[in-house]
C-alpha cells in the first residue's frame, strides 16, 4: 500500500509531523479546522508568485501563529514590511484572535516536492513541452542532493485528444520504507486543453539512522554478502534494501 497512500500521511508520527498543531474540544474542533482550510486557501491564492511550500498553523492559548515556508520571502514581506503587516491584519480578521506571522525561507526549492510541482505546472501553462519540464526538474533535484525523484503528469498532455499519464524517475524512491524521508507535492496546470495534474515524490535519504534496529539490520546484510564482496566494494542488492 506504500505505492498508493500519500507518503506524508503514511509517515505521520514516525518521521513527519502535522502542519496544523493545536488541540480543541469537540465543540470547537470543526470551526478551527475550517479556519485552517480558509487560511491556507487564502494564502495560496494571494501569494501565488511567492512559491509557498507549506503553511504551518499553531494555536497557543487564544492566539494563532502562522508560519509560511516560501521560496521568495521578499515578495511576502514587501517594502519595509508593509505587505506582511497587511497580511497579518487580514489573518487576524479571519481568526478573530491575535495572529503572529512568521516567514521561513526555503533554501533549496529544487528539492521541495510542492515547489517542484508548482514549477512544472507553471511551465505547462506557458506551453513548455511536458517531457522537457519533467527532465529539467529531475536533473536539478539530483544535482542538489536528492537521492531519488519521481514525477508524474496526467491529462491532455501536448493537447492530445485522449488523456494519459506520463512519468519519469531517477534514483531510488522507496515508498514502502518508513524510515525514508520522502517529500510529496501536487499541483494543477490550467492549460488551454484542460487541467493537467502533477505529482512529485523526492527521496532525501533515511532519517532514522540512530535507530539501533536499523543499524543491526544493515550489519546483518553486510555479513550476508561475505568479506569478498565487501573487499571488492560491490554495491548491496537494491531489492534487499527496499524489502
UniProtKB/Swiss-Prot annotation:
Gene3D superfamilies per the UniProt record, alphabetical: 3.30.300.20, Ribosomal protein S3, C-terminal domain
Entry-linked InterPro entries: KH_dom, KH_dom-like_a/b, KH_dom_type_2, KH_sf_prok-type, Ribosomal_S3_C_sf, Ribosomal_uS3_bac-typ, Ribosomal_uS3_C, Ribosomal_uS3_CS
A Pfam short name: Ribosomal_S3_C
CDD domains: KH-II_30S_S3 (cd02412)
A GO molecular function held by the record: mRNA binding
Any single biological process term in GO: translation
A GO CC annotation given for this chain: cytosolic small ribosomal subunit
PROSITE patterns: KH_TYPE_2, RIBOSOMAL_S3
Keyword RNA-binding (UniProt): yes
Domain of life according to the entry: Bacteria
Ranges annotated as biased composition (Basic and acidic residues): 229-243
Residue ranges of domain KH type-2 in the record: 39-107
SMART domains: KH
Keywords: Ribonucleoprotein, Ribosomal protein, RNA-binding, rRNA-binding
Region (Disordered): 214-243
Signal peptide: none
Function: Binds the lower part of the 30S subunit head. Binds mRNA in the 70S ribosome, positioning it for translation.
HAMAP family found in the cross-reference section: Ribosomal_uS3_B
UniProt subunit comment: Part of the 30S ribosomal subunit. Forms a tight complex with proteins S10 and S14.
Family the UniProt entry places it in: Belongs to the universal ribosomal protein uS3 family.
Matches recorded under PANTHER family: 30S/40S RIBOSOMAL PROTEIN S3, SMALL RIBOSOMAL SUBUNIT PROTEIN US3C
The protein's name in its UniProt record: Small ribosomal subunit protein uS3
Organism of this sequence: Agrobacterium fabrum (strain C58 / ATCC 33970) (Agrobacterium tumefaciens (strain C58))
Biological classification of the source: Bacteria, Pseudomonadati, Pseudomonadota, Alphaproteobacteria, Hyphomicrobiales
Gene: rpsC
Amino acid at each position: 500500500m506504500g505505492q498508493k497512500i500519500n507518503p506524508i500521511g503514511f509517515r505521520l508520527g514516525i518521521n513527519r509531523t502535522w502542519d496544523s498543531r493545536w488541540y480543541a474540544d469537540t465543540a470547537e474542533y470543526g470551526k478551527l479546522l475550517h479556519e485552517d482550510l480558509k487560511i491556507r486557501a487564502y494564502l495560496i491564492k494571494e501569494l501565488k508568485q511567492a512559491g509557498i511550500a507549506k503553511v504551518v498553523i499553531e494555536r497557543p492559548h487564544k492566539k494563532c501563529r502562522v508560519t509560511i515556508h516560501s521560496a521568495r520571502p521578499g515578495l511576502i514581506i514587501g517594502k519595509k514590511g508593509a505587505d506582511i503587516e497587511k497580511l497579518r491584519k487580514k489573518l487576524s480578521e479571519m481568526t478573530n484572535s491575535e495572529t503572529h506571522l512568521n516567514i521561513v525561507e526555503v533554501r533549496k526549492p529544487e528539492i521541495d516536492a510542492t515547489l517542484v510541482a508548482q514549477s512544472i505546472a507553471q511551465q505547462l501553462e506557458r506551453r513548455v513541452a511536458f517531457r522537457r519540464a519533467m527532465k529539467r526538474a529531475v536533473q536539478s533535484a539530483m544535482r542538489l542532493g536528492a537521492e531519488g525523484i519521481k514525477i508524474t503528469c496526467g491529462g491532455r498532455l501536448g493537447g492530445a485528444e485522449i488523456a494519459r499519464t506520463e512519468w519519469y524517475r531517477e534514483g531510488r524512491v522507496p515508498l514502502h520504507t518508513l524510515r525514508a524521508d520522502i517529500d510529496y507535492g501536487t499541483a494543477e496546470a490550467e492549460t488551454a486543453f484542460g487541467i493537467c495534474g502533477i505529482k512529485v515524490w523526492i527521496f532525501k535519504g533515511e532519517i532514522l539512522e540512530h535507530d539501533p534496529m536499523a543499524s543491526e539490520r544493515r550489519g546483518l546484510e553486510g555479513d550476508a554478502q561475505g568479506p569478498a564482496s565487501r573487499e571488492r566494494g560491490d554495491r548491496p542488492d537494491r531489492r534487499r534494501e527496499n524489502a
